[in-house]
Structures are given as structure tokens and as C-alpha cells.
UniProtKB/Swiss-Prot annotation:
One of its GO terms (molecular function) is NADP binding. D-glyceraldehyde 3-phosphate binds at residues 150-152, 181, 210-211, 233. The active site is at residue 151. Belongs to the glyceraldehyde-3-phosphate dehydrogenase family. SUPFAM superfamilies: Glyceraldehyde-3-phosphate dehydrogenase-like, C-terminal domain, NAD(P)-binding Rossmann-fold domains. Keywords: Cytoplasm, Glycolysis, NAD, Oxidoreductase. GO terms for biological process: glucose metabolic process; glycolytic process. Homotetramer. It comes from Yarrowia lipolytica (strain CLIB 122 / E 150) (Yeast). It is found in: Cytoplasm. NAD(+) binds at residues 12-13, 34, 79, 316. PANTHER family: GLYCERALDEHYDE 3-PHOSPHATE DEHYDROGENASE (PTHR10836), GLYCERALDEHYDE-3-PHOSPHATE DEHYDROGENASE-RELATED (PTHR10836:SF76). PROSITE patterns: GAPDH (PS00071). This is Glyceraldehyde-3-phosphate dehydrogenase.
Length: 338
């Protein structure tokens, strides 16, 4: 029996979560809610994607919903999450992907409509955060609202976990060179909280803040207070890259670290989550890659055996959305056996 899922917010992540879910027989998306997109437009936006290409299957708007490859998905247009009839639609697990309801209390509104569990596809200030392959052991079935953390945390955490488990991280700094996202501006415009963030996205490298490195301390408590970082927003439409520079306790050559990362990428715990490449790749080579993090063996460097720079790629849309689906499957299995 497939896990019944609803998606609130049919933006970049909502639509790509649906693309990933359609490939997974363990999951069935039964409903989508978005107050700003009518059904015809939802079908168009799902079918055509400037970054990930045209959807290969059949998409049509019919009977107040979407029919994708013969499967009917109800479409709602409620602004208030508590009014979305998830229960009537049969959706037990709801992906909260509006980017608005990221707090535990706000996301809990979905439970009033009949949802049993809410997965926030963004970092949360107070909901428990989970990174697949890193801290799923901490999940408890009585948790009703959880977060899949951020795309950058999903890239950084597996990398940091492998390094810390083998060598011990003393401290580190992270920079993510991050593609454009929907919150940025096409031309200079007002952005009162972040003045630099109001500048033209397509023509600037924009320094920005990110909580991704600090969030790793929440999913790997041993690293709490040992990592922080920043972001550089760059004019590419998709795919980002983490630069993690760390001091390690147990000295190792860069060659040894590469071997450790390769072995980890093939391990049962991280296969499909942590990737490994030793080829001369660039960012567009990773569009559509479903790994959370792809270690670039040729791009990193070591100053000495205790001070290294590690580079890891991620499709901040597709890879992250794949993990949202994986998280749903993982928690549903734990819920079923509780």
C-alpha cells in the first residue's frame, strides 16, 4: 500500500517533489494545494520546466485536478493550511513547501485538515530537523511536524559526518556557492532585511548569510559550535557547491581522505545520498542528480595533514526534493512499526 502524500505549495520544490514521488512506487501524491495557481496553470508549470526539462509523461487538467500518467491528483486553493481537506483527499503525510509555514505551530495547522504528519521542506527554528543518511535514528513516531532541513545542510551533513567519524573535526568554515532561488530579484529592488539580496541576481555574485553549517550541529550534536558558514549567490539557475575547510584531529593525507569518501559513498548507509566523482566536472553536469552531496575528489586540496578543503556538489532543487520523498518513506515505515 503506497504512502498517501499531499503537497502544500506548488513552487520549485513542490513540483520537483512531485516529479520524484512519481518515480517512487512506495509513494502516491493524492493532493496538491496552492492558492495562487489554478489547475490549468499547475498542469502547464508541471509539464514545462526551464531547468529540468519537459516532463516525459502525460499531464492534463481535468475534473478540478491534475491527471498525470493516468493518476488523478486533487488540487485545492486554500490560503489557510487548516482549511485544506487533506483527510478527505486521503493524504496522511503533507509536504509543507510554501516556504511560509516553517515553524512548528504554523505547520501544525495541516493536522486540523486531517494530515497525520507534516514534513517541512525548509529549515525550521523549532521543529526537529532530519537529514537522510545522518540522523534518522533520532526520529520518534510521536513527532507530528518535522523538517527536512535545507538543501545545503543536506549536502554538508553527510560530508561532515564522514570526515568527523574518521578523523574528528576540530573546527571548520563552510562556503556554499549557491545558484539563484525564487526569493532573489531579476533587477535591483527593495530588500529591507538584506540589502545585497535586493541586487540583480543574474548579474552579480552576492554574499549572503546561511544557517546551514550551524544546522549541522543540530543533526550531528558532536559538531555543535564547531562549524559556521556563509553563502555566495551566483548567476546560475541550478546546482550549488559546498566548500568545507576544516582542521582535523587525526592527521591524514588528501589521498587518504579521498579513499574514505569513496568508501562512504559505496556504503549501505550513504549509497545514493553521498556521491563521488574524480572526473573534470562542472555545475551543469549535476542537473537532475538525486544525490544530496557529490564529493569532488579533483577539486579539494590539503595544506597539510590536519588542514583540508573539501568540495561537494548538489542539485539544490532535484537532490533535495529526492530526500524529501526518502524522508517520508523512512518515517512512514517507522510509524507503521510503532
Amino acid at each position: 500500500m503506497a504512502i498517501k502524500v499531499g503537497i502544500n505549495g506548488f513552487g520549485r520544490i513542490g513540483r520537483i517533489v512531485l516529479r520524484n514521488a512519481l518515480k517512487n512506487p512506495e509513494v502516491e501524491v493524492v493532493a496538491v494545494n496552492d492558492p495562487f495557481i489554478d489547475t490549468e496553470y499547475a498542469a502547464y508549470m508541471f509539464k514545462y520546466d526551464s531547468t529540468h526539462g519537459r516532463f516525459k509523461g502525460k499531464v492534463e487538467a481535468k475534473d478540478g485536478g491534475l491527471i498525470i500518467d493516468g493518476k488523478h491528483i486533487q488540487v485545492f486553493g486554500e490560503r489557510d493550511p487548516s482549511n485544506i481537506p487533506w483527510g478527505k483527499a486521503g493524504a496522511d503525510y503533507v509536504v509543507e513547501s510554501t516556504g511560509v509555514f516553517t515553524g512548528k505551530e504554523a505547520a501544525s495547522a495541516h493536522l486540523k485538515g486531517g494530515a497525520k504528519k507534516v514534513i517541512i521542506s525548509a529549515p525550521s527554528g523549532d521543529a526537529p530537523m532530519f537529514v537522510v543518511g545522518v540522523n534518522l535514528d533520532a526520529y520518534k513516531p510521536d513527532m507530528t511536524v518535522i523538517s527536512n532541513a535545507s538543501c545545503t545542510t543536506n549536502c554538508l551533513a553527510p560530508l561532515a559526518k564522514v570526515v568527523n567519524d574518521k578523523y574528528g573535526i576540530i573546527e571548520g568554515l563552510m562556503t556554499t556557492v549557491h545558484s539563484i532561488t525564487a526569493t532573489q530579484k531579476t533587477v535591483d529592488g527593495p530588500s529591507h532585511k538584506d540589502w545585497r539580496g535586493g541586487r540583480t541576481a543574474s548579474g552579480n555574485i552576492i554574499p549572503s548569510s546561511t544557517g546551514a553549517a550551524k544546522a549541522v550541529g543540530k543533526v550531528i550534536p558532536e559538531l555543535n559550535g564547531k562549524l559556521t558558514g556563509m553563502s555566495l549567490r551566483v548567476p546560475t539557475v541550478d546546482v550549488s557547491v559546498v566548500d568545507l575547510t576544516v582542521r582535523i584531529k587525526n592527521g591524514a593525507s588528501y589521498e587518504d581522505i579521498k579513499a574514505t569518501m569513496k568508501a562512504a559513498s559505496e556504503s549501505p548507509e550513504l549509497k545514493g545520498i553521498l556521491g563521488y566523482t574524480d572526473e573534470d566536472v562542472v555545475s551543469t553536469d549535476f542537473i537532475g542528480d538525486t544525490h544530496s552531496s557529490i564529493f569532488d575528489a579533483k577539486a579539494g586540496i590539503g595544506l597539510n595533514d590536519n588542514f583540508v578543503k573539501l568540495i561537494s556538489w548538489y542539485d539544490n532543487e532535484y537532490g533535495y526534493s529526492a530526500r524529501v520523498v526518502d524522508l517520508i518513506v523512512a518515517v512512514a515505515k517507522k510509524d507503521a512499526s510503532a
